[in-house]
Amino acid sequence: MKKTTVINSEISSVIAGMGHMDWLGIGDAGMPVPLGTKKIDLALTKNLPSFIDVLKNVLTELEVQKIYLADEIKTKNPEQLQAIKQLMPNVEIEFVPHSELKKDLAKTHAFIRTGEMTAFSNIILESGVVF
Protein backbone atom coordinates (compact mmCIF):
# COMPACT_ATOMS: atom_id res chain seq x y z
CA MET A 1 0.00 0.00 0.00
CA LYS A 2 1.16 3.53 -0.79
CA LYS A 3 2.86 5.27 2.15
CA THR A 4 2.60 8.90 1.09
CA THR A 5 -0.35 11.18 1.73
CA VAL A 6 -1.93 11.25 -1.75
CA ILE A 7 -3.82 7.96 -1.84
CA ASN A 8 -6.30 8.89 -4.58
CA SER A 9 -5.04 6.77 -7.47
CA GLU A 10 -6.04 9.22 -10.20
CA ILE A 11 -4.39 12.22 -8.52
CA SER A 12 -1.29 10.19 -7.70
CA SER A 13 -1.01 9.01 -11.30
CA VAL A 14 -1.37 12.53 -12.72
CA ILE A 15 1.30 13.92 -10.37
CA ALA A 16 3.65 11.04 -11.15
CA GLY A 17 3.31 11.77 -14.86
CA MET A 18 4.02 15.49 -14.62
CA GLY A 19 7.27 17.05 -15.72
CA HIS A 20 8.83 20.46 -15.24
CA MET A 21 6.41 23.31 -16.03
CA ASP A 22 3.38 21.04 -16.50
CA TRP A 23 0.08 22.29 -15.10
CA LEU A 24 -2.49 20.84 -12.70
CA GLY A 25 -5.75 22.59 -11.81
CA ILE A 26 -7.70 22.43 -8.57
CA GLY A 27 -10.96 24.23 -8.05
CA ASP A 28 -14.38 24.77 -6.66
CA ALA A 29 -17.47 22.79 -7.53
CA GLY A 30 -18.70 25.35 -10.05
CA MET A 31 -15.61 25.67 -12.23
CA PRO A 32 -16.38 24.63 -15.82
CA VAL A 33 -13.92 22.09 -17.16
CA PRO A 34 -13.08 22.26 -20.88
CA LEU A 35 -13.96 19.24 -22.99
CA GLY A 36 -10.93 17.02 -23.31
CA THR A 37 -9.46 18.01 -19.93
CA LYS A 38 -9.29 15.12 -17.48
CA LYS A 39 -11.59 15.85 -14.53
CA ILE A 40 -10.97 14.16 -11.21
CA ASP A 41 -14.21 14.78 -9.34
CA LEU A 42 -13.80 14.58 -5.57
CA ALA A 43 -16.92 16.59 -4.69
CA LEU A 44 -19.16 14.71 -2.26
CA THR A 45 -21.41 17.49 -1.01
CA LYS A 46 -21.21 21.22 -0.34
CA ASN A 47 -17.71 22.09 0.90
CA LEU A 48 -16.57 18.48 1.15
CA PRO A 49 -13.75 18.16 0.47
CA SER A 50 -12.67 21.76 0.73
CA PHE A 51 -10.43 23.42 -1.81
CA ILE A 52 -7.71 24.11 0.74
CA ASP A 53 -7.67 20.52 2.06
CA VAL A 54 -7.22 19.15 -1.45
CA LEU A 55 -4.52 21.73 -2.21
CA LYS A 56 -2.65 20.82 1.00
CA ASN A 57 -2.79 17.15 0.05
CA VAL A 58 -1.52 17.71 -3.50
CA LEU A 59 1.32 19.90 -2.24
CA THR A 60 2.69 16.98 -0.23
CA GLU A 61 3.70 15.33 -3.51
CA LEU A 62 3.91 18.03 -6.17
CA GLU A 63 6.83 20.45 -6.38
CA VAL A 64 5.31 23.79 -7.39
CA GLN A 65 7.30 26.69 -8.81
CA LYS A 66 4.47 29.01 -9.82
CA ILE A 67 0.72 29.36 -9.37
CA TYR A 68 -1.99 31.04 -11.40
CA LEU A 69 -5.00 32.61 -9.72
CA ALA A 70 -7.92 34.72 -10.90
CA ASP A 71 -7.52 38.47 -10.33
CA GLU A 72 -10.97 38.42 -8.78
CA ILE A 73 -9.81 36.37 -5.78
CA LYS A 74 -8.13 39.51 -4.39
CA THR A 75 -11.46 41.24 -3.76
CA LYS A 76 -14.05 38.45 -3.92
CA ASN A 77 -12.29 35.83 -1.75
CA PRO A 78 -9.33 37.39 0.11
CA GLU A 79 -9.52 34.77 2.87
CA GLN A 80 -8.84 31.99 0.38
CA LEU A 81 -6.00 34.02 -1.13
CA GLN A 82 -4.40 34.35 2.31
CA ALA A 83 -4.75 30.61 2.93
CA ILE A 84 -3.05 29.88 -0.41
CA LYS A 85 -0.21 32.29 0.34
CA GLN A 86 0.31 30.68 3.75
CA LEU A 87 0.68 27.26 2.14
CA MET A 88 3.12 28.50 -0.50
CA PRO A 89 4.84 31.62 0.83
CA ASN A 90 7.79 31.42 -1.56
CA VAL A 91 5.95 30.48 -4.74
CA GLU A 92 5.49 33.03 -7.51
CA ILE A 93 1.87 34.05 -8.13
CA GLU A 94 0.54 35.25 -11.46
CA PHE A 95 -2.92 36.79 -11.42
CA VAL A 96 -5.01 36.50 -14.59
CA PRO A 97 -8.65 37.30 -15.39
CA HIS A 98 -10.99 34.50 -14.32
CA SER A 99 -12.09 34.05 -17.93
CA GLU A 100 -8.47 33.35 -18.91
CA LEU A 101 -7.96 30.94 -16.01
CA LYS A 102 -10.99 28.96 -17.22
CA LYS A 103 -9.56 28.75 -20.74
CA ASP A 104 -6.13 27.76 -19.40
CA LEU A 105 -7.62 24.64 -17.82
CA ALA A 106 -7.48 23.14 -21.31
CA LYS A 107 -3.67 23.14 -20.94
CA THR A 108 -3.63 21.24 -17.65
CA HIS A 109 -2.89 17.55 -17.20
CA ALA A 110 -6.05 17.36 -15.10
CA PHE A 111 -8.51 19.40 -13.08
CA ILE A 112 -9.41 18.28 -9.57
CA ARG A 113 -12.96 19.32 -8.67
CA THR A 114 -13.57 19.81 -4.96
CA GLY A 115 -16.79 20.42 -3.06
CA GLU A 116 -15.73 24.02 -2.37
CA MET A 117 -18.57 26.53 -2.53
CA THR A 118 -16.73 29.84 -2.31
CA ALA A 119 -16.13 32.02 -5.34
CA PHE A 120 -12.82 32.01 -7.20
CA SER A 121 -11.37 29.06 -5.27
CA ASN A 122 -9.47 27.90 -8.33
CA ILE A 123 -5.77 27.50 -8.99
CA ILE A 124 -3.39 26.24 -11.62
CA LEU A 125 -0.19 24.76 -10.23
CA GLU A 126 2.94 24.80 -12.37
CA SER A 127 5.28 21.97 -11.48
CA GLY A 128 8.87 22.60 -10.58
CA VAL A 129 11.82 20.27 -10.26
CA VAL A 130 13.19 18.66 -7.12
CA PHE A 131 16.84 18.89 -8.11
Curated annotation (Swiss-Prot):
The name of this protein is D-ribose pyranase
The positions annotated for binding substrate are D28, H98, F120, S121, N122
The source's domain of life comes to Bacteria
Kindly give the HAMAP family that the UniProt entry links to this protein.
D_rib_pyranase
Q: Which organism is it from?
A: Oenococcus oeni (strain ATCC BAA-331 / PSU-1)
What function does this protein fulfil? Catalyzes the interconversion of beta-pyran and beta-furan forms of D-ribose.
Q: Where found?
A: Cytoplasm
Q: Name one GO cellular component term.
A: cytosol
Catalytic machinery residues: H20 (proton donor)
Q: Which InterPro entries match?
A: D-ribose_pyranase (IPR023064), RbsD-like_sf (IPR023750), RbsD_FucU (IPR007721)
Involved pathway(s): Carbohydrate metabolism; D-ribose degradation; D-ribose 5-phosphate from beta-D-ribopyranose: step 1/2
